[in-house]
């Protein structure tokens, strides 16, 4: 009888759980509908989709509701998931942004296909050819039969070469610390997706390349933004970073030299950020693809010795191998293994012939792409200042990130420039910096001068 009673009790509990679950599903559907309506209202008044103050207020209400219930941690993670879903619903319902830098690039390519001449200053793509020895190694690998499936972490020789290069920063590394990836973008995705869970939080310092936040949101990870300003010379306030960290925070993303500002943090400030992460046992995801493009002293995050550091690198920038789609990540062995398992699921491995091309590139002397681009950047900066843009530095990378005069909107200026044959990147795509534009220095000096003539004409109100 006691067994039958227990079985009936179990059945009743399951029925109650089913009822609660179905009610949650109904409430989620209702909540998504409200999110869409809120998104429409925001668009009507020009309000941003992401509202940090509103999210903080809701978080406080949830914490108060959980007091004494013992479920605060789970409720907080669930709230992060719900916030992400609301942001995604509102973003998906919004008309596609016509002025993101990717949208500008795609439209510029379409115009070129129609026969229009476009000056490309919207993308950070070196215009030099890949190293000849890399192209030769690609062909040789195919001829030698290196065309089969490879292992997810990458070929051993390439991982050894990357480990040797990155060991100069003071942390001894082996191939077990390296995973070869489809460019740095995919390395960033692998790090976020494999090391964080839905409901976790990632701190991003803005202005920032949008892929950090995009990868996080696709993984169900809540993005907390720490905003920097031109007036502060793009240096983050350590107290603001500390305030942004919650019990759900698992990672801080940094990128120096920075895209889009070209900022290189002083060693002391970068160390302070990493120390904050170390005290909280957080991962530091350091995107260091612009390391060769520095006009001032630069330090890798690996120099800190923090044992939860992940560094991403790409041969796109260092060796002008953008179309090869190859890079790598440096991480503790356990984390590298987790990233490799996810890469195996997503794409098996980086194409083996491409890895042999990358190996040849890393073994040779670095090409002159960085040196050439930095010279162009030095020439672009005074032209941007003469056009009336306000900016700091830049200390490196390949961009000028400038505030437009007279409060002009970067998106509107970018569209008008494109109509006249110049593609530039609006600042809004890098974290809500609407009055800014990003100018890339990856073209020959005469081409950059022609592009700046177009920008000057637009800013002065002149005709086509």
Go through the PLM ranges and name each one.
Residues 1-95:
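Domain-level signature for soluble enzymes in the chorismate/prephenate branch of the shikimate pathway
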Residues 38, 62, 82, 104, ...:
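Aromatic/hydrophobic pocket-lining residues that form π-stacking "cages" and hydrophobic walls in ligand
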Residues 39, 60-67, 163, 340-343, ...:
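Amphipathic alpha-helical segments within well-ordered protein domains
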Residues 64, 92-109, 114-136:
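N-terminal basic, amphipathic alpha-helical segments
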Residues 111-114, 125-126, 132-133, 138-141, ...:
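PLP-dependent class I/II
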Residues 119-127, 140-158:
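A glycine-/small-polar-enriched, mobile loop at the entrance of the PLP active site in fold-type I
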Residues 149-181:
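Conserved N-terminal alpha-helix of the aminotransferase class I/II PLP-enzyme fold
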């Amino acid at each position: 009888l006691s067994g039958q009673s227990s079985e009936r009790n179990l059945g009743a509990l399951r029925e109650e759980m089913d009822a609660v679950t179905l009610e949650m599903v109904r409430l989620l559907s209702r909540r998504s509908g409200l999110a869409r309506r809120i998104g429409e209202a925001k668009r009507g008044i020009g309000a941003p989709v992401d509202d940090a103050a509103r999210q903080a207020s809701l978080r406080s209400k949830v914490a108060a509701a959980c007091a004494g219930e013992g479920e605060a941690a789970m409720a907080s993670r669930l709230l992060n998931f719900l916030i992400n879903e609301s942001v995604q619903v509102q973003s998906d319902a919004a008309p596609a942004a016509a002025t993101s830098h990717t949208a500008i690039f795609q439209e510029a390519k379409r115009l070129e296909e129609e026969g229009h001449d476009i000056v490309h200053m919207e993308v950070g793509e070196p215009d030099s050819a890949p190293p000849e020895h890399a192209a030769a190694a690609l062909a040789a690998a195919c001829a030698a039969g290196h065309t089969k499936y490879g292992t997810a972490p990458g070929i051993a020789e390439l991982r050894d070469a990357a480990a040797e290069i990155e060991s100069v920063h003071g942390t001894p590394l082996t191939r077990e610390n390296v995973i070869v990836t489809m460019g740095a973008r995919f390395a960033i995705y692998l790090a976020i997706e494999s090391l964080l869970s839905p409901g976790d939080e990632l701190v991003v310092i803005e202005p920032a390349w949008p892929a950090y936040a995009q990868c996080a949101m696709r993984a169900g990870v809540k993005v907390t933004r720490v905003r920097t300003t031109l007036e502060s010379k793009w240096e983050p306030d350590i107290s603001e970073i500390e305030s942004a960290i919650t019990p759900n925070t698992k990672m801080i993303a940094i990128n120096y030299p920075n895209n889009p500002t070209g900022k290189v943090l002083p060693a002391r400030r970068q160390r302070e950020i990493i120390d904050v992460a170390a005290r909280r046992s957080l991962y530091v995801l350091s995107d260091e693809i612009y390391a060769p493009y520095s006009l001032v002293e630069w330090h890798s995050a690996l120099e800190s010795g923090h044992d939860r550091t992940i560094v991403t690198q790409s041969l796109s920038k260092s060796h002008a191998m953008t179309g090869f789609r190859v890079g790598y990540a440096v991480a503790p062995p356990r984390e590298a293994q987790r990233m490799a398992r996810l890469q195996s699921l997503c794409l098996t491995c980086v194409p083996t012939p491409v890895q042999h091309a990358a190996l040849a590139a890393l073994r040779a002397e670095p090409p002159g792409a960085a040196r050439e681009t930095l010279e162009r950047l030095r020439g672009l900066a005074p032209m941007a200042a003469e056009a009336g843009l306000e900016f700091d530095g830049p200390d490196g990378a390949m961009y000028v990130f400038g505030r437009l005069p007279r409060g002009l909107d970067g998106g509107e200026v970018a569209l008008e420039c494109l109509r006249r044959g110049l593609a530039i990147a609006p600042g809004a795509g890098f974290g809500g910096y609407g009055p800014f534009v990003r100018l890339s220095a990856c073209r020959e000096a005469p081409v950059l001068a022609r592009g700046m003539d177009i920008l000057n004409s637009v800013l002065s109100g002149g005709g086509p």
